[in-house]
Structure formats: C-alpha cells, structure tokens
Amino acid sequence: MATLSVKPSPRFRLPDWQTNSYLLSTNAERQRDASHQIRQEARVLRNETNNQTIWDEHDNRTRLAERIDTVSRWKEMLDKCLTDLDAEIDALAQMKESAEQNLQAKNLPLDVAIECLTLRESRRDIDVVKDPVEEELHKEVEVIEATKKALQQKISQAFEKLFLLQEARQRLNSDHRGKMETLDIDRGCLSLNLTSPNISLKINPTRVPNGSTSLQQWDDLSRFNKDHGEAEMKKAIELREAIALTIAETNNELEAQRVATEFAFRKRLREMEKLYSELKWQEKNTLEEIAELHEDIRHLEEDLRRKLQNLKLCHTRLEARTYRPNVELCRDQAQYGLTDEVHQLEATIAALKQKLAQAQDALDALYKHLARLQADIACKANSMLLDTKCMDTRRKLTVPAEKFVPEVDTFTRTTNRTLSPLKTCQLELA
C-alpha cells in the first residue's frame, strides 16, 4: 500500500495569507499613488523649469542686447572722442610747427641786428656815440630775445600737451579696443541658440575672473577716459589759441621795432648828411681862405723884400754921405730926410714882419683846422657808409631771400645804381 511522502515545511495560516494579499494590494495602490504624485510633480516641475529656462534665456538675451546697446553707445562716444582727439593732435602739432618756424625765422632779424651793431663798431673818433640808432638796435635785440623766449615757452608747452594728448588717446584707444572686443564677444553670445554646434559644458563657468569690476566701476572708468580726453582737448584748444596769439603779438612787436629802428636809421642818416654838407661847405670856404691867405702872404713877402731894398738904398745913401769931406759933413735936410726914411722903413719892415708872422700863424691854424675838418668829414663819410650798409643789410627783413641783391658789398662798392656825388665822396674817404 502506497504511502504519502510530504516534505516537512512551515505552514502559514489563512489569516496570514489574507493579510499578505491585502498588504500587496495596499502597497501597490500606495506605490501607484506615489508614482502618480511624482508624475504630477514632475510635469509641474517640467512646465515650471521650461518656463523659467525660456524666461531666463529670453531675459538674458534681452540683457545681452541692452548691454550691447550700452557698450555700442559708449563705443560711438569713444569713436567721436578719438576722432576729435586725433584732429586736435594734428591741429596742435601744426600750430607747434608754425611756432617753431616763427622761432627759426627770428634768427634772421637777430643776426641782422647784431651785424648792424657790429658794423657800427667800426665808427671812428667822435662818431662813436650812443645815438638813438644804437639804442633802437639794442632794444631790437632785446625784443627778439623776448619773442624767442615766449615762442620757445609755448613750443615746450605744446610738446608737453601733445604728450598728454597722446597719453589720453592711448587710454581712449585701449578702452575703445576693449569695447570692440566686448561687442564681438557679446554679439557672438547673442547669436548662440540651442541648436548652435559650438555650445558645450564648461568647467566652472560661473567663476569670477581676476580683475573683474563692477558695473559702476566700468561706467566710471569709461566716463573718466572720455571726460579726461575732452578736458585735455579743451586745454589743447586754449593752448593753440594762446600760441596763435603769441605768434601774432611777437610778429607785431618785432615789426613795430623794425619800423622804429629803420626810422632812427633814416633820421640819423639825414642828420649826418646835413652835417656832412655843412662840413664840406666849411672845408671849401677854409680852402678858399687858405688860398687867399697864401696870396696875401706872398704880397707881404714881396712888400717886405721891396722895403728891404728901400732900406738898403737909404743905408747906402747914408753910408755914402758919411764920406763927405770936412765941413761938408753936415746934417742937412737930406741927412734928416734919409734918417727919417730909415726909421720909417724899419718900422714898416717890423710891422710887415709882424703881420707876416700873424699871417703864417693864421695859415697854420687854418691848415690844422682843415685837417680836423677833413678828418671829421672822413668820419662822417665812414659813419654814413656804415649806416647805409646797415640799411642795405636790413633789406633782408623785407625782401625774400631769393630776390635779395646787396646794394653795398663787402668791399664798400655799390652795384645796380648810380651814386650821387655825396655817396661817391663817402666811398672815396672811406
């Protein structure tokens, strides 16, 4: 007879089985409810995050666009400031060059004034006088030195200002380049989208790079660079106006002094020509007086010789009558007449000798004074020649260098004109 073989195992009770089924069913429902809740929350989260992401992307795109507009406006302001600054640098450089040319041009008047002073050092004797011409020439040298000093000061100021303008331009240019690069970067960022092929995850993109500044610092720095450049341009404009005024004033002062100096030269030349004519007239009269005195001396000498002959005759007669014999040797009327004649002749001869001596002394005095007159005439001729050469030299100040032809050369000869007798005499005496 067959037997039932039963593996021994624990047996659950029916309530346990029922409880297990209930728990499974209950847990299934609870898990489904939890899953449903998670699904609902996930849907809400997805919607919210999608909306937030879309909004954030739109908001940041708007911010990027606004930032691009802001940087673009600053870039345009910097563009204008740089353009104005470049124009001002060119204008100031041209004004500085003009001042340098004016400074260089002052060398010619200075050389001419010094040459005139040097030429006038060749005056002789009494003509070496501190006259108005010399005073005006010294004043001209002082005016030229003062104008050169003023121009040199303005040139130095322009050089320093150009350096400051270049420095401001470098700051503006650096700021401008930075904004150009920023615009390129931000425009590139604005052009990116979700389908762009070059987007990727980066390592710590939210880090704050070293050297970062706040928006206020950025705005302050940009404004400072712009304001600094504009302030330097304003100062440069004022300096340009001051340089132009200095050039005009120095040219006017120098021209006024040139006119005053040449007026003094012309006045002095007229004075010397008048005195030269007076001295020549005195020389002519003195020469005529000398000639007349020579003639009178000759007549005196002839009269003296005749009187000596008359005296010899009287002496001979008186001497001969001393040999009359005996009583014939009497003092008769003839004797008294001859004696009186001798005394008269001796007095006449003495008077003639005295007058001849006086005439000789007068002649010597006339010759000495004539020598002084001629020496002074030579001095005046020399002085007039020197001042004429000075006036000719000063023509360089008004005649272009390529058209300048000296009227008086270094050998005291004149060219290209006919000399007056007075000028010819001046050159001969010189």
From Swiss-Prot:
A GO-annotated cellular component: sperm flagellum
The keyword Ubl conjugation is annotated on this UniProt entry: yes
Compartment annotation: Cytoplasm, Cytoskeleton, Cilium axoneme; Cytoplasm, Cytoskeleton, Flagellum axoneme; Cytoplasm, Cytoskeleton, Microtubule organizing center
Gene Ontology process terms (BP): cilium assembly; cilium movement involved in cell motility; flagellated sperm motility; inner dynein arm assembly
One Pfam family this sequence matches: Tektin
Record keywords: Cell projection, Cilium, Coiled coil, Cytoplasm, Cytoskeleton, Flagellum, Microtubule, Phosphoprotein, Ubl conjugation
PTM annotation, UniProt: Tyrosine phosphorylated. Ubiquitinated, leading to its degradation. Deubiquitinated by USP16, promoting its stability.
Tissue expression per record: Expressed in trachea multiciliated cells.
Coiled coil region boundaries: 81-162, 265-379
Homology family: Belongs to the tektin family.
PANTHER family per record: TEKTIN, TEKTIN-2
Known function: Microtubule inner protein (MIP) part of the dynein-decorated doublet microtubules (DMTs) in cilia and flagellar axoneme. Plays a key role in the assembly or attachment of the inner dynein arm to microtubules in sperm flagella and tracheal cilia. Forms filamentous polymers in the walls of ciliary and flagellar microtubules.
Subunit structure: Microtubule inner protein component of sperm flagellar doublet microtubules. May interact with CCDC172.
This protein's name: Tektin-2
Originating organism: Bos taurus
Name of encoding gene: TEKT2
